Amino acid sequence: MSEEVLIVEDRLVEGSSPNGGAISIWTLNRPDKLNALNSDSHIAIKEQCLRVESDDNIRCVVIRGAPPQIPEEGGKQKPPAFAAGADISEFLEKGSDDVRPFFEDNAWEAVWNLSKPTIAMVDGFALGGGTELALSCDIRIASDRSTFGQPEINLGLIPGGGGTQRLCRLIGYGKTMEIVLTGGMVSSDEAL
């Protein structure tokens, strides 16, 4: 990978159990692109799911987005983002046929199937694939400045990664259809 798209830190939790235990914290690390998810992100998440599943010391996974970088003088501060969806520029650079296998072999399904609890710590935008990643987690915690949405319809697509099914299970058919068909966004207050 050309950049470290996922920073992983396993933190030991003192007194968590007689045998000890750790929390694996995964930070989506593309703040310059609002933590947009690319094929390298998918590979890294799937690799970490395999690692965590086989490590009995890890008790829980927390997924979060890297905070925005401080701009150079005169630069504009980017908003915070958990993950602003798929990195569309990768589709344009590599072509959809080269990128499609990474998205079809779904990393979100690997998160969903983990036997250990998963927590999405959402601060800022969780759009498209970012919402789908959060939906794949067992628990979602969002700051008051978070926004969730499924804007894929604006590209002539429907949400992938289990987004329509998981969203429908959580908020019902009517609200899911409203979000999916309009590309609308909801605040953390409305979403949670």
What does each model-found stretch correspond to?
Residues 110-192:
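Crotonase-fold acyl-CoA enzyme core
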Residues 26, 30, 44-45, 63, ...:
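Terminal peptide-recognition signature
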Residues 29, 64, 94, 143, ...:
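Conserved residues at the C-terminal ends of beta-strands
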Residues 43, 57, 65-110, 126, ...:
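Glycine- (often His-adjacent) and acidic-residue-rich active-site loop
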Residues 1-72:
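Conserved CoA-thioester-binding segment of acyl-CoA-metabolizing enzymes
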